[in-house]
């Protein structure tokens, strides 16, 4: 009797796990990948933040407990977002962008300043970073614009320029904080989405060259950015000054070797490496889990990116353009931000202050990226429902 009761209670979970993928109306693998990354992030934040948490608060697991709260908020908000139909996102994409602009303007007036950058709005439980909201809002808006003005983007320069004006407006507010890293992520993702939508190659090349030129000017205009570039080119020239963070990160990579020092055994996190639990958590992963652990984490992230690109291609192939463009945008965003974060930790690119998706400590980043994953799941779900309800094609149509 008890066994039958247990089987009855477990049957929904059994169906969820063992039902063949073609019959399921959502991507289970995508959920497991995202949860795996979030669990990895929780473990690594607990390990990397232990020393600084003890010094600042007297509680060794202070940042871990806050990160657990962020994970709970992220999963709760994502479960709500998952129920919102895509046509609602398309309909209110302009409103979402306007809210982001207002938040970016507000942070310049009443924002909390950390290390000379005013990027956060204090909300009690956590500090909201409007730049993270602006990323997702922009990509949703661009996807909606590409649906409404697809022909104009492909055929006229005017249609190509309009979304760039929105990007320039957001970039202005971001650079006032200042936040060049988020601006670069938005720029790269936007031009990639326009290119996928059919923008002309010469427009794409001209925009890339213009963007590179602008970044160079912005670097030369600010001494602290120039110091980051020079320290990136030769960090050992000033290992206790401008090159300190990068040299400590490189030492973490060197200590990790193939299999790492073991979970919790990092030396660099003992307040030698600044931002060990946030922007440079990947260096702690490299030191504690080694080359093998680094490869496993990167495989998880790029599996998520690959899933996003597959979902985008499937949607576009079946004329689900809003979901398709948005899925491509999310995939490119995750991929580029990962490359920049990992590249900064490994000394391949200058430090940009970007988080490692779903892993680094930070409430705004974790919540917004979790919402992005839930959007991917929703996009895939609606595409599967559309294909399930699509009338079978006739033999004549298949021959054509």
From Swiss-Prot:
Residues 1-29, 82-95, 144-155, 200, 312-321, 378-400 are cytoplasmic. It holds the Pfam family FTSW_RODA_SPOVE. It comes from the Bacteria. GO terms for molecular function: lipid-linked peptidoglycan transporter activity; peptidoglycan glycosyltransferase activity. GO terms for biological process: cell wall organization; FtsZ-dependent cytokinesis; peptidoglycan biosynthetic process; regulation of cell shape. Pathway: Cell wall biogenesis; peptidoglycan biosynthesis. Its EC number is 2.4.99.28. It catalyses: [GlcNAc-(1->4)-Mur2Ac(oyl-L-Ala-gamma-D-Glu-L-Lys-D-Ala-D-Ala)](n)-di-trans,octa-cis-undecaprenyl diphosphate + beta-D-GlcNAc-(1->4)-Mur2Ac(oyl-L-Ala-gamma-D-Glu-L-Lys-D-Ala-D-Ala)-di-trans,octa-cis-undecaprenyl diphosphate = [GlcNAc-(1->4)-Mur2Ac(oyl-L-Ala-gamma-D-Glu-L-Lys-D-Ala-D-Ala)](n+1)-di-trans,octa-cis-undecaprenyl diphosphate + di-trans,octa-cis-undecaprenyl diphosphate + H(+). It is an enzyme of class 2 (transferase). It is a multi-pass membrane protein. The chain crosses the membrane at residues 30-50, 61-81, 96-116, 123-143, 156-176, 179-199, 201-221, 291-311, 322-342, 357-377. Residues 51-60, 117-122, 177-178, 222-290, 343-356 are periplasmic. Keywords: Cell cycle, Cell division, Cell inner membrane, Cell membrane, Cell shape, Cell wall biogenesis/degradation, Glycosyltransferase, Membrane, Peptidoglycan synthesis, Transferase, Transmembrane, Transmembrane helix. Peptidoglycan polymerase that is essential for cell division. NCBIfam families: ftsW (TIGR02614), PRK10774.1 (NF008042). PANTHER family: CELL CYCLE PROTEIN, PEPTIDOGLYCAN GLYCOSYLTRANSFERASE FTSW-RELATED. Belongs to the SEDS family. FtsW subfamily. This is Probable peptidoglycan glycosyltransferase FtsW. It comes from Aliivibrio salmonicida (strain LFI1238) (Vibrio salmonicida (strain LFI1238)).
């Amino acid at each position: 009797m008890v066994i039958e009761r247990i089987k009855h209670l477990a049957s929904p979970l059994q169906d969820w796990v063992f039902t063949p993928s073609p019959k399921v109306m959502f991507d289970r693998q995508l959920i497991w990948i995202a949860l795996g990354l979030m669990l990895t992030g929780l473990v690594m934040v607990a390990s990397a933040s232990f020393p600084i948490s003890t010094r600042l608060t007297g509680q060794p697991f202070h940042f871990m407990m806050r990160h657990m709260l962020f994970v709970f908020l992220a999963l709760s908000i994502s479960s709500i977002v998952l129920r919102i139909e895509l046509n609602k996102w398309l309909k209110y994409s302009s409103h979402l962008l306007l809210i982001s602009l207002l938040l970016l303007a507000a942070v310049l007036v009443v924002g909390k300043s950390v290390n000379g950058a005013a990027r956060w709005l204090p909300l009690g439980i956590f500090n909201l970073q409007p730049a993270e909201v602006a990323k997702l809002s922009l990509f949703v808006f661009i996807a909606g614009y590409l649906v409404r003005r697809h022909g104009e983007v492909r055929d006229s320069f005017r249609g190509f320029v309009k979304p760039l004006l929105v990007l320039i407006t957001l970039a202005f507010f971001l650079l006032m904080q200042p936040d060049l890293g988020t601006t670069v992520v938005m720029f790269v993702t936007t031009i990639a989405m326009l290119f996928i939508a059919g923008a002309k190659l010469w427009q794409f090349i001209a925009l890339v060259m213009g963007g590179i030129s602008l970044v160079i000017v912005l670097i030369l205009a600010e001494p602290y950015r120039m110091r980051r570039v020079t320290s990136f080119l030769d960090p050992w020239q000033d290992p206790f000054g401008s090159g300190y963070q990068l040299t400590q990160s490189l030492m973490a990579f060197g200590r990790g070797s193939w299999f790492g020092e073991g979970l919790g055994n990092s030396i660099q996190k003992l307040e030698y490496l600044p931002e060990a639990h946030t922007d440079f958590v990947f260096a702690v992963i490299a030191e504690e889990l080694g080359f093998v652990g680094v490869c496993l984490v990167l495989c998880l992230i790029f599996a998520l990116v690959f899933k996003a690109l597959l979902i985008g291609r499937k949607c576009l192939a079946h004329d689900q353009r809003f979901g398709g463009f948005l899925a491509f945008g999310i995939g490119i965003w995750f991929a580029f931000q990962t490359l920049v974060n990992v590249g900064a930790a490994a000394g391949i690119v200058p430090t940009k202050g970007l988080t490692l998706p779903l892993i680094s400590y930070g409430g705004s980043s974790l919540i917004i990226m979790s919402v992005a994953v839930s959007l991917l799941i929703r996009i895939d779900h609606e595409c599967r429902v559309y294909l399930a309800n699509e009338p079978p094609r006739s033999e004549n149509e298949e021959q054509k």
